[in-house]
Structure formats: structure tokens, C-alpha cells
A protein has these predicted regions:
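Short glycine-rich phosphate-binding loop at a beta-alpha junction
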Residues: 51-61
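Short, glycine/charge-rich flexible loops or terminal/linker lids adjacent to PRPP-binding catalytic cores
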Residues: 66-109, 114-122
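Conserved beta-strand scaffold positions in the cores of enzyme catalytic domains, especially
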Residues: 55, 77-84, 137, 151
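Structural motif
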Residues: 54, 104-106, 136
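Glycine-rich phosphate-binding loop signature in dinucleotide/nucleotide-binding domains
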Residues: 47-51, 100-101, 129
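Active-site-facing substrate-recognition patch
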Residues: 1-51
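PRPP-dependent phosphoribosyltransferase catalytic core
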Residues: 3-11, 123-171
Length: 171
């Protein structure tokens, strides 16, 4: 089992579901440099022509990713927008940008569940440019029940072969 799977299994033992799980997951992901650099390598393989796209990052995860990989991200993408966090728990997205250099956006985030964060951000981006869209969302953890179109994840909770569940041995 890889390191990411082990760490997620450990969190699931303590927090099997809900906001406590996502809070613990978020804290673990943004504090692990190895997982963040693995994520960037994973994401690079999922994005076609990043130099023509705007990268959307959110909250503490976005800040952590920029701190570790910012130079590389600035070289890869036409533009980068960092949006406030807390959208999953009800905060409205705040975008400090008046012009999108490209309306074709890609979103990197730590986790995905229902798509609420992505959809709220896309609505705000459309206020800046009516043709704005988030074509692909690349995440570390995908907890959505059904596979979502245009969501790529390193770890999918509801996968057909959940090998990581072997580590959920409760003592």
C-alpha cells in the first residue's frame, strides 16, 4: 500500500465520515510535502496544454501547493488564481481578479465530494468572464459516490478495488 493510502486509512480509523474527516484530511495533505509533489506530478499527466489555461487553487491547500511548487506552476499555466477556503462549509468564493487571462480553467484541490466548491467557484468565474468554465478538476481525495466526469483523483474512496481498506484494521 502506498503512503497516501496508509495516511488516509489512519484518518478513517479516527474519523470515519463527515466534516471531522475532511478537516483531518485537509490538515494532513497540506502538511505533507511528498504527497503535494506527487500530486503535482499526477496532475501534470492529466492536463492538456496547461499553458493555455487558468489554474484555480483554493484555501490553505492552494497556499501550500504554491509554497512548494509555485515556480513550476507559474511556468506551466497561463494564469493562477488563489481563492479563499471554507467554501465546502458555506463560505462564498472571493476572487480578487478582474480579468481572466484564459476562461479555460483547471482546478487543483485537496478533496472532492459533491462538486459544490467547484460549482460555486465556476459561477463566480462566469461573473468575470461569461465563457469561463472549469474543464478538469484534479484532486488528491475523491469521496463522491459516483464517478464524476472531468474529475481526476489520486485516491478514490468508492473505487471498484479499494485495496486501502485492508489497512482499516481496528485494534
Amino acid at each position: 500500500m502506498n503512503r497516501l493510502n496508509q495516511k488516509i486509512a489512519e484518518i478513517l480509523k479516527q474519523h470515519p465520515e463527515g466534516e471531522d474527516f475532511f478537516d483531518a484530511l485537509d490538515a494532513m495533505l497540506r502538511g505533507d510535502m511528498d504527497i503535494l509533489t506527487q500530486f503535482l506530478s499526477f496532475a501534470e499527466d492529466k492536463i492538456y496544454s496547461p499553458e493555455t489555461k487558468t489554474l484555480v487553487l483554493t484555501g490553505q491547500f492552494g497556499i501550500a501547493l504554491m509554497n512548494i511548487c509555485g515556480e513550476k506552476l507559474r511556468k506551466m499555466f497561463k494564469d493562477i488564481i488563489l481563492i479563499n477556503g471554507g467554501i465546502r462549509t458555506g463560505s462564498e468564493p472571493v476572487i480578487y481578479c478582474e480579468v481572466l487571462k484564459s476562461p479555460n480553467c483547471v482546478m487543483f484541490d485537496d478533496s472532492f465530494y459533491s462538486g459544490t466548491t467547484r460549482d460555486k467557484i465556476e459561477s463566480k468565474l462566469k461573473m468575470i468572464h461569461s465563457g469561463a468554465s472549469i474543464g478538469t478538476t484534479v484532486v488528491i481525495y475523491d469521496g463522491s459516490i459516483n464517478v464524476q466526469q472531468n474529475v481526476c483523483s489520486m485516491f478514490r474512496y468508492h473505487s471498484e478495488e479499494p485495496l486501502w481498506k485492508d489497512d482499516l484494521v481496528y485494534e
